[in-house]
A protein has these predicted regions:
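Conserved glycine-rich cofactor-binding loop
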Residues: 7, 12-16
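The beta1-alpha1 cofactor-binding region of Rossmann-like NAD(H)/NADP(H)-dependent oxidoreductases
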Residues: 40, 61-72
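A glycine-rich helix->loop->beta "capping" turn
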Residues: 52-55, 75-88
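Rossmann-fold cofactor-recognition segment
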Residues: 51-65
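Aromatic pocket-lining residues of Rossmann-like dinucleotide-binding sites
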Residues: 25
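Conserved glycine-rich Rossmann-like NAD(P)H-binding loop of the short-chain dehydrogenase/reductase
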Residues: 28-44
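Structural signature of the Rossmann-like NAD(P)-dependent dehydrogenase/reductase core
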Residues: 10-11, 88-91
């Protein structure tokens, strides 16, 4: 699969399934925006993806807040100039 020039926003990507999806998409060339309630978790995953040659950013986001969601989308588009894939993985 080739996801070059595609950008994905993955909620709940600081651990578990969301982290796995983010890592897989990055390995196929996608820019990934890791979104989660705990910034330190998504930052750690983003840093590792970047160190492995991928392109990732981390954003703290509460998916129960429209403002927080909008800020995450705006930050993703600002960084990567697009948003092509949305993975809704966040859970309580």
């Amino acid at each position: 699969m080739d996801f070059s020039n595609k950008t994905a926003l993955i909620t709940g990507s600081g651990q578990g399934v969301g982290e796995g999806i983010a890592r897989a998409l990055a390995s196929y060339g996608a820019n990934v925006c890791l979104v989660g309630r705990t910034l330190s978790k998504v930052e750690a995953v983003a840093e590792d993806i970047n160190q492995q040659g991928g392109s990732a950013i981390a954003i703290e986001c509460d998916v129960k807040s429209n403002e927080s969601i909008n800020n995450s989308i705006e930050a993703t588009i600002s960084k990567f100039n697009s948003l092509n894939i949305l993975i809704n993985n966040a859970q309580e």
